Amino acid sequence: MPNFKSKKIKEINLPYSKDDVEFLWLAKNDNVSLIYTKVQEESFFLQIKKAQNGFVIKGDKHTKPSKIGYLQKALKIFKEGFCEDIINEAFGLKNNALIEKTPFIVDNFDELLSRLQGKIYIEIGFGSGRHLLYQAKENPNVLILGVEIYNPALTQVAKLAKAQNVNNILLIQSDARLLLSVLKSKSVEKIFLHFPVPWDKKPHRRVIGKDFCKECARVLVQNGRFELRTDSFEYFNFTLEQFLTFPAPKFSLRKNENLEISSKYEDRWKKQEKNIYDLWVWNFNQECKNYELNEFNLSSVEFSKEDLKKIEQNFKNITIKKDDFFLHFESIYKQDENLLLKVAFGAFNKPEHCYLHLDKTIDFAFKEPFKIQENIKAINELKEILKVQFKI
């Protein structure tokens, strides 16, 4: 994560803007200050944290922009405008950093869903993008949707797609399980999962599970196919067991088959003479329906100045666990007379992190989380906790 360390920070008078970077407002607690930052069409927090002999300035990991160049540029402008005695820095803004909006990266699910059409392939954890770009070139009439947790991978593959004149890809930063949950039923032709982290000693952390397999079956078209490629026999066998719970699935099992394209991980495993396993699954015959999305309905909550004082005074770092969702109050920040809450919530295997801005009403400081049922339930619980636990 790009960052730098400074001995001194000047007085921060906001709003402040320079070179398409805007610092609009600041919220803080005893240890951390958050600066609401806009670069072109994206918003995120810069984080200032007290450290030994100074301050560490970096991007907040739960609001970081989809393009690393935005964060690098914001750090550069903040350093030049507000900092003295720089101790060290690790955010050099390169001339080829991806700053301009790229059509290959979508910022949220609403934008994604509006752009999905025709035949769709999904690659989960596309990494360096070798296989994803290969599929895009081989299937020019198919939209290749790549989902990846790590932002740098999105930026790298978007650059490669532009350089190679590949136009039929879309990339999104997300947990794959969350992505599948928002897609329409029977809308995807193929799902690729190549060389996932096997988690052989911690199988509960695997993306594969019963719910994931059900979602694959729901979103795949009739005779649509799930394809796993892995060097872990344990992962291969575990995945097979999950799909065997369906009534009459069909399988293709292969070992050490050379494909037309090889990822950097596959190259490494072959040099180590590891076995490579392929598992293809289709014919799920899964009855399914599209989910009806509800609203968060935050407009029903109103606060007085006295309410906000009580929330600030009575705030506790607490976690509420229900059968199918959780809610964790992580931190609270003061923004003039208003408050900022950081919370984690949602399904246990698809957690969300977000900031809520509290003034006379309550709203999400950034984009809304997607309206899956677990998130709706968690936000409804949050509204009740604010009234009961924090005594307003």
UniProtKB/Swiss-Prot annotation:
Pfam families: Methyltransf_4 (PF02390). Its EC number is 2.1.1.33. S-adenosyl-L-methionine binds at residues 123, 148, 175. It catalyses: guanosine(46) in tRNA + S-adenosyl-L-methionine = N(7)-methylguanosine(46) in tRNA + S-adenosyl-L-homocysteine. Pathway: tRNA modification; N(7)-methylguanine-tRNA biosynthesis. One of its GO terms (cellular component) is tRNA methyltransferase complex. Substrate binds at residues 201, 231. PANTHER family: 3-DEOXY-D-MANNO-OCTULOSONIC-ACID TRANSFERASE/TRNA GUANINE-N 7 - -METHYLTRANSFERASE, PENTACOTRIPEPTIDE-REPEAT REGION OF PRORP DOMAIN-CONTAINING PROTEIN. Catalyzes the formation of N(7)-methylguanine at position 46 (m7G46) in tRNA. This is tRNA (guanine-N(7)-)-methyltransferase. It comes from Campylobacter jejuni subsp. jejuni serotype O:2 (strain ATCC 700819 / NCTC 11168). The lineage of its organism: Bacteria, Pseudomonadati, Campylobacterota, Epsilonproteobacteria, Campylobacterales.
